[in-house]
């Protein structure tokens, strides 16, 4: 299996578990996908009301993303339907829906994740989603 195919397979399995567990598979991401020194970013860049969606520079800090996400939101679905791989980069495209626990509002959004791998582990990640819809659901 090529490195590109292996990286795609790693992500397919992680996203499958993420969806099936409704977000309870955080440890799998850390054990099987994320490198210790990952650069992890998100379009909101930590702006309220999506403070957890910020820049993280290692796996220890990155726990804050998942803690914030899962304490504030409940996953409805998460589906990555398309993967594009070139060299050490994989782009995953799909959609997800989350309900904000405090407001009860639903956010459905297209989702694009950019990944860069080295030695089978993700060293860079950046996510793109409808931040206006997420902010509206959170307020």
Where are these regions (language model features)?
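Short, low-complexity N-terminal intrinsically disordered segments enriched in polar/charged residues
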Residues: 1-32, 139
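A beta-strand edge to alpha-helix "cap/lid" segment located at domain peripheries
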Residues: 2-5, 67-139
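A structural signal for well-ordered alpha-helical scaffolds and beta->alpha junctions
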Residues: 4, 8, 22-23, 59-66, ...
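Hydrophobic pocket/interface hotspot
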Residues: 11, 25-30, 34, 38, ...
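Hydrophobic alpha-helical core bundles mediating ligand binding, dimerization, or RNAP-core interactions
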Residues: 11, 15-18, 34, 66-69, ...
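Generic anion/oxyanion-binding catalytic loop in active/binding sites
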Residues: 15, 51, 104
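A solvent-exposed, acidic/Ser-Thr-rich amphipathic alpha-helical stretch
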Residues: 28-87
């Amino acid at each position: 299996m090529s490195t590109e195919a292996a990286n795609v397979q790693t992500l397919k399995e992680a996203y499958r578990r993420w969806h099936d567990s409704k977000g309870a598979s955080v440890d799998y991401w850390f054990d099987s996908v994320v490198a210790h020194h990952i650069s992890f970013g998100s379009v909101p860049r930590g702006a309220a009301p999506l403070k957890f969606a910020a820049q993280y520079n290692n796996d220890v800090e990155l726990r804050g993303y998942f803690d914030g996400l899962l304490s504030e939101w409940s996953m409805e679905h998460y589906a990555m339907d398309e993967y594009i791989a070139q060299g050490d980069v994989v782009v995953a495209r799909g959609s997800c829906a989350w309900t904000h626990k405090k407001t009860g509002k639903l956010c459905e959004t297209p989702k694009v994740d950019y990944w860069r791998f080295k030695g089978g582990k993700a060293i860079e990640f950046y996510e793109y989603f409808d931040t206006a819809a997420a902010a509206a659901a959170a307020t």
